[in-house]
């Protein structure tokens, strides 16, 4: 019911007032997106485009956005540069914390997930990065839009940030990903699923 109330409220607020992350906003078409980027968006597949927004964060090297003809821009994912780190994940956790602070200031309290699989071999603190690389540890933070914070979220319904490695055998460097889902993401992904 809460989600329906949020959808109802946002439906009557003009989308153009929402200035989203990296200077991007919900519903942008490809022309508008190109104007907000340093280069033309590069098509990948299935509504996904690789972009370099003019307003980018220095930690992030790459950005992938989901844009459809029907919904415009509906999802953003940023990927950081590789961060050299110890087996304990000290450096990547520090960078993660640096990102959490401004996000918490803007969007409020988050739900942090630091979950280790019960059946993993990598239980010691010195195995922190091995557990991340193996997929046995989830280290993320999540925000979700509610009736109380709908204006603060500026057209977003969810924000998530986490730590991963590029491959299971890499445990001395990691990257941070961040994802923003706009209100129209539900329709965007549903439309994408309809063609499968």
Where are these regions (language model features)?
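Intrinsically disordered, low-complexity segments enriched in polar/charged residues with Gly/Pro
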Residues: 10, 51-54, 128-130
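Non-cytosolic coordination micro-motifs
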Residues: 20-47, 82-196
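Long, hydrophobic N-terminal alpha-helical segment
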Residues: 30-43, 47-71
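Compositionally biased, low-complexity repeat tracts
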Residues: 16-19, 23, 58, 68, ...
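Generic marker of residues within folded, mature protein domains
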Residues: 9-11, 66, 133
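Sec-dependent N-terminal signal peptides
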Residues: 4-17
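Mid-chain, structured segments of secreted extracytoplasmic proteins
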Residues: 56-102
